[in-house]
Regions:
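A glycine-rich, hydrophobic loop/mini-helix early in the fold
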Residues: 121-163, 167-169
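Conserved NAD+-utilizing ADP-ribose enzyme module
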Residues: 1-106, 153-159, 167-259
Length: 259
């Protein structure tokens, strides 16, 4: 069910039901302040994506991807936007979907996924990337809370393989190793592997999903024919410990040199 409101306060109380939120709710907010996009759970509110309409040129696609993706999950959705904005977004989005098989002009041609040294060995052995929940089901890892739970990520995030550019993936690896959300891009950590994958092929084969802010794949993604390059500390000339900033820069440089 979709609910549109003009005003919204992030709090533990759902303005639609008057009760506390449960996992069946998700919120998308158009704002005029802050960063381009911020996601997570704030002040006890449901998982939310806040999108700054003034600097996010793709806000209409982001909004409608969020609606499409979460509707398929059976979620109740709160959209904080004007009626005109919602109508405009739907007109722009007509003919599109969160699982469409063609890359959009705003989407990257290369997807990046970062992993720990231990997980990279497992990935090479099985020849595929697998979601956390798939690995738990196969007995490959012990069930424990993912690091994203500290940010308010919904439980179903563990059904997906997530991608992110820049230093984001290395921050996730570093945070896992440190046991807390460590946003310091210069903090020492042990790099694993930084994988570069062909986004157009992944989309064309029906794997790519869009949730309003992330690009991701559900359950399993074979390495072949999508993996373009795998960077490790050794392959980019880093000995021992590194930092998210150092490793991501060196890995990107190595990948760019073979393109």
């Amino acid at each position: 069910m979709l609910y549109r409101v003009n005003r919204f306060t992030e709090s533990p109380i759902n303005p639609i039901t008057g009760d506390k939120y449960d996992d069946s709710w998700a919120v998308f907010m158009l704002t005029d302040r802050g960063e381009k996009q911020v996601c997570g759970s704030f002040n006890g509110c449901a998982y939310s994506i806040k999108t700054n309409r003034s600097i996010c040129a793709e806000w209409a696609f982001s909004l409608c991807d969020f609606i499409d993706f979460n509707s398929r999950l059976g979620k109740n959705i709160i959209v904080v936007a004007t009626a005109d904005e919602l109508e405009t977004a739907r007109k722009i989005y007509r003919g599109h979907g969160c699982d469409e098989r063609t890359l959009r002009s705003s989407e990257p041609a290369v997807l990046v996924h970062s992993t720990t040294p231990e997980n990279w060995q497992r990935i090479k052995q099985c020849g595929a990337l697998k979601s956390r929940n798939r690995l738990i089901a196969e007995g490959c890892i012990v069930e424990e809370k993912p690091i994203g739970a500290l940010l308010g990520d919904p439980a179903e995030f563990s059904d997906y393989i997530m991608f992110g550019g820049g230093v984001t993936g290395e921050i996730v690896v570093s945070s896992r190793q440190h046991g807390f959300i460590d946003m310091d891009i210069n903090a020492p950590y042990r790099p694993g592997a930084r994988l570069y994958l062909d986004a157009a092929k992944i989309a064309a084969d029906g794997f790519l999903l869009r949730d309003g802010t992330h690009l991701k794949v559900k359950n399993v993604l074979p390495l072949k024919p999508y993996l373009l390059f795998a960077a490790t500390a050794e392959s980019v000339g880093i000995c021992g410990a590194s930092t998210p900033a150092e490793f991501s820069k060196a890995a990107d440089k190595a990948f760019d040199s073979i393109r």
